[in-house]
Amino acid sequence: MTDTRIDDDLTVVQTLSPELRPSWSDVTSAGIFRVEPNGRFDKHYHDCDEYWLLFAGRGLVSVGERTYTVGAGDIVCTPTGTEHDIVAVAETLEGFWFEGRTPPGGRFGHLYRTAEDAEGHVVEPLEEGEA
């Protein structure tokens, strides 16, 4: 369910999208995500910067050519055009994402370099001590 309430000083949006974004906002989209072991995710990129603020779980994420161990309290910062992915999860990974402003002519949402990336993949479970 998406709900938006706008007045002069405050906007409350449960899930932010380009259609619901207040005109003064630099955020293209935002929301909550949850990825479980054996869940699905996709390697993708955006025409804007994206940020994940993680509040639960542990796992491995890739940003560009590097892989990082992440957990609650970490912020994953992905520059425009850089592929990123949730590779594996030890404990259900939960976080808040937001995308910066998409430039004029930019595309919205997940973008893919290959058809295989667009299909997504199973997020491998990690054993204790692997992440």
Question: At which residue positions do the language-model features occur?
Answer:
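Short, conserved beta-strand element in jelly-roll/cupin
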Residues: R34-E36, Y45-V61
